[in-house]
Amino acid sequence: PVFQSSRHALYQEALELLSKLSFDEISDIISTGSNDSKPCSTTAGNEAATSEATPLIYPCFCSRADIRAASAPQEGDRFTVYPGTCRRLIASEPQRAKQRLANNDRHSMRIATADTTITFHDEVFGTQQYHLAHDIGDIIVRRSDGIYSYQLAVTVDDLDMGITDIVRGRDLLRSNALQIYIRKALIKAGFKPSEPTQPFHPADGSNKPDDVTISYAHLPLIDNAAGQRLAKRERSLDLGILTAHGATAQQIIGYCAWLLGLQGDLKHTKPQPMSADEALGVFSWDAVRTNTSDRTLDQGEFNAYFGL
């Protein structure tokens, strides 16, 4: 997401809009879907029709230890499905919840997810289906320290900036279903781009956020020789370090194109520098989806290619 200090007011506005919705007010986008993202659909279960008392955004007083003790972690992408403790508290003891808020008890804010399956097409991994309540649960949209969550921030950023081609890592496939849900709720709540003087002009010719066709693609991850994912939190090698050591744009683009399979089978080819125009000229999703396994970086070959 865009650096939070410069977008804090926009994220706050988005959360305030969502907070004005009750759970039953978004039942139409749950049961019939919304055309803001044509490659996806929703299928609602029975729970959505019986959750009228549940606010869409609600406070959560649980600690991380509480959640770990009551939840079963999901495999692969580190998702832990929230057990719904405070959602039940809001429904069964609303006055107790209000009193805790009045006492300034530390709390985060969560979005209530529905008994709903969201289906979308991914350019690399094909048709994806996730049940919001079972596979994802009610996730935090604002932490107890006031920081807005990644899930809310990227959804707001994409909607605000009119992004129509969403490309992330394959570990965020499950998150994409949640972001579709949040996006639909934001549109229902009347969210508007922060800079209306810059018209929304998606490539497909539509002119409103709820008309636009969105393309989703999730790419294989890059692992080191030990099988650990390269990530900022692990202080993995990044573009700043590469450019500081003299790596050229053509070298970097060529290496990325090679990793994506645009220069042939990774086992039988070596990366070759190329320009952005050259990479675009050979790009196709068919080539990328030929090999959807995570890539393992050979540090010696990597260093030799970049002259490190």
Model features per residue range: what roles?
Residues 8, 64, 79, 83, ...:
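Alpha-helix initiation and N-capping motif
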Residues 9, 13, 106, 174-177, ...:
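Generic recognition of short, well-ordered alpha-helical interface segments
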Residues 18-25, 74, 183-186, 246, ...:
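Alpha-helix boundary/capping residues
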Residues 226-308:
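Conserved catalytic-core subdomain
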